Design a protein with these regions (language model features):
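An acidic/histidine-cluster motif and surrounding catalytic segment
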Residues: 1-105, 109
């Protein structure tokens, strides 16, 4: 693992179809000076049907707009809908392959 005891815990942020909540969460993270030294992984699940498509697209566009504001940001757009539990489980496992610790957030926290 590349992590060590002196690095900040990376953040795994899970999003789906709530762009307003996601914006609030991202803005809150940016208020913390430590975010410049923190890895931010954002996992976006794919929409299930056309009812969620527009909101999911807004989430993707918002993340693209915010990507330049974070120094260490990786956005993972799922190619198929995994569902909340699988998206979170797989995302956490992916982060733990690179780091020894993690902070988990959802877009509405």
């Amino acid at each position: 693992m590349e992590g060590n005891k002196h690095e900040y815990a990376p953040i795994a942020l899970f999003a789906f179809k709530r762009p307003k909540h996601l914006k609030i969460t991202l803005d809150s993270l940016l208020l913390n000076p430590e975010i410049k030294k923190t890895f931010l992984y954002v996992f976006v699940d794919k929409f299930l049907d056309n009812n969620d498509k527009e909101a999911n697209l807004k989430v993707k566009n918002l993340l693209k707009d915010y990507s330049y504001k974070f120094q260490n940001m990786e956005i993972i757009f799922n190619k198929k809908n995994k569902g909340l539990a699988n998206n979170i489980t797989e995302g956490i496992k992916a982060v733990f392959k690179k780091h020894e610790k993690i902070i988990v957030l959802e877009d509405d926290i």
